[in-house]
């Protein structure tokens, strides 16, 4: 069945070319904390509707998110012509079923549900779709602006098999705070995943807590205040 509600029609985000990940890029010369002339490894990318952020290593040995470096390293036309990434149907269905209402209330939503009250449509239109590419995983997300003006990032990975899950989650937390300006992060976890016990331990290690939800039978939700 076609999705009639734009809230659930996850816009395909610009895919990350394989040659970008693990490549080198120059630091942003505008930043005050970068060492000029040093090149850094690209560890992950985040694409939004209008921007692309690069997660790269630092001379000190850590990693951080920055913007604009990719724009300078490749022509804007090439950036615009990147292929579009297919959004798996199960990910769209997961957001469709378990994504809270803009008020923060988790409510049952079925594939036959109506478009919703007109007073909510403006809030749905404000939801921004993003994609985060790592070398071992790809995350589909929605950034929602809540009624109080705060932002929440909802994420579903294409795979939970990433052996570097903790490092990836730390990078995503930095992204949510420093670049997307979110105050809360929520992850959707498949309850049928064979690695669920390990995942729960990893999520608790990073600082996530289970969230109560209604009628979300296939997924467990884990959240963190940022």
Swiss-Prot record:
Pfam families: ODC_AZ. Interacts with ODC and thereby sterically blocks ODC homodimerization. It comes from the Eukaryota. PANTHER family: ORNITHINE DECARBOXYLASE ANTIZYME. This is Ornithine decarboxylase antizyme. GO terms for cellular component: cytoplasm; nucleus. Ornithine decarboxylase (ODC) antizyme protein that negatively regulates ODC activity and intracellular polyamine biosynthesis in response to increased intracellular polyamine levels. Binds to ODC monomers, inhibiting the assembly of the functional ODC homodimer, and targets the monomers for ubiquitin-independent proteolytic destruction by the 26S proteasome. Belongs to the ODC antizyme family. GO terms for biological process: ornithine metabolic process; positive regulation of protein catabolic process; regulation of polyamine biosynthetic process. GO terms for molecular function: ornithine decarboxylase inhibitor activity. Transmembrane segments: none annotated.
């Amino acid at each position: 069945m076609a999705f009639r509600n734009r809230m659930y029609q996850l816009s395909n985000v610009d895919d990350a070319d394989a040659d970008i990940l693990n490549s080198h890029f120059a630091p942003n010369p505008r930043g005050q904390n970068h060492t000029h002339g040093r090149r850094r490894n690209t560890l992950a990318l985040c694409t939004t509707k209008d921007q692309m952020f690069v997660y790269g290593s630092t001379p000190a040995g850590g990693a951080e998110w920055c913007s604009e470096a990719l724009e300078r390293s490749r022509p804007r036309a090439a950036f615009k012509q990147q292929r579009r990434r297919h959004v798996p149907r199960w990910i769209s269905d997961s957001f469709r079923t378990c994504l809270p209402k803009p008020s923060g209330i988790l409510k049952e939503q079925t594939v036959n549900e109506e478009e919703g009250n007109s007073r909510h449509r403006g809030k749905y239109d404000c939801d921004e779709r993003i994609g985060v590419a790592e070398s071992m995983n790809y995350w589909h997300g929605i950034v929602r602006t809540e009624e109080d003006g705060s932002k929440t990032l909802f994420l579903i990975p294409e795979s939970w098999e990433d052996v570097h899950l903790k490092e990836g989650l730390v990078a995503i937390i930095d992204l949510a705070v420093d670049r997307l300006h979110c105050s809360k992060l929520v992850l959707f976890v498949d309850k049928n995943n064979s690695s669920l016990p390990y995942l729960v331990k990893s999520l608790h290690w990073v600082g996530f807590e289970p969230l109560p939800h209604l009628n979300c039978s296939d997924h467990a939700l884990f959240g963190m205040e940022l």
